[in-house]
């Protein structure tokens, strides 16, 4: 929260994954986008809290990869609710900007599977059409299980997603963006190594690759 507050005067839009729904009141004036992670998307309190947001919110598919669970989460967040939040009875009107985020999946044996390919996106388009959801949209998380945490693969995956937008009008209409993990220095480090600008969690693209990839995305949107 301190980092978010200190950057509030900048022109950079800020996004955060919401781990704890009860903390929303502390950061709601600082964020322009909220993601609900794969391990939280099935939690009812996360779904209900998002229904009261006035910013775009992305629901990631669960680690199982189940599209129906993900879309049911979007359905819940897009509709109004009465529920107890931080000790108060509250009413929400629903968040029409709730959408899905595809982040790949993990099998019961621990193997990763991808869900950014053409056939996955077409299947998602069809499932969206079958449900009573407004503003059907998807963001593709190109790291996590989609890359198997091989962070350099993000570059290739982004190009594939952008190509699929070019060859299918349905995919182009639905896929609004990609989610990339990047930082100043590429890769990651263990806590205590103290390399400035290097991730201590998931491995990330470095500054140069991130910059070049943004230019590639811009070119492929033309």
Where are these regions (language model features)?
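Single conserved hydrophobic/aromatic residue that forms the stacking wall/gate
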Residues: 1-9, 13
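Solvent-exposed alpha-helices and their adjacent loops that cap or buttress functional pockets
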Residues: 6, 50-51, 90-94, 170-172
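Acidic, His- and aromatic-enriched active-site or binding-groove loops in soluble protein domains
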Residues: 7, 31-57, 79-83
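N-terminal active-site wall of soluble small-molecule enzyme domains
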Residues: 10, 18-26
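Catalytic-site microenvironment of enzymes
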Residues: 11, 27, 126, 130, ...
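General beta-strand structural signal in soluble alpha/beta enzymes
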Residues: 14-18, 57-61, 180
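Conserved mixed alpha/beta catalytic, RNA-binding, or beta-rich assembly cores of soluble enzyme
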Residues: 52, 59, 64-159, 163
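Catalytic-face loop-and-helix region of soluble metabolic enzyme cores
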Residues: 105, 109, 133, 139-200, ...
């Amino acid at each position: 929260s301190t980092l978010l507050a200190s950057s509030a005067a900048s022109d950079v839009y800020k996004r955060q994954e919401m781990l704890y729904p009860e903390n929303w009141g502390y950061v709601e004036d600082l964020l322009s986008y909220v993601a609900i992670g794969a391990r939280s998307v099935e939690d009812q309190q996360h779904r209900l809290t998002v229904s009261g947001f006035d910013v775009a919110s992305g629901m990631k598919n669960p680690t199982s990869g189940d599209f129906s669970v993900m879309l049911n989460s979007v359905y819940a967040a897009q509709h109004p609710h009465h529920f107890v939040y931080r000790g108060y009875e509250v009413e929400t009107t629903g968040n029409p900007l709730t959408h899905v985020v595809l982040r790949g999946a993990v099998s019961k044996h621990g193997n990763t599977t991808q869900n950014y390919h053409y056939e996955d996106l077409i299947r998602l388009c069809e499932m969206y059409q079958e449900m009573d959801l407004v503003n059907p949209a998807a963001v593709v998380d190109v790291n996590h299980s989609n890359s198997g945490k091989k962070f350099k693969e993000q570059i290739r995956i982004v190009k594939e997603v952008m190509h699929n937008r070019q060859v299918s009008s349905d995919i182009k209409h639905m896929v609004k963006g990609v989610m990339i993990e990047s930082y100043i220095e590429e890769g990651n480090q263990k806590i205590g190594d103290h390399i400035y600008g290097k991730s201590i969690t998931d491995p990330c693209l470095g500054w140069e690759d991130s910059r070049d990839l943004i230019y590639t995305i811009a070119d492929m949107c033309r």
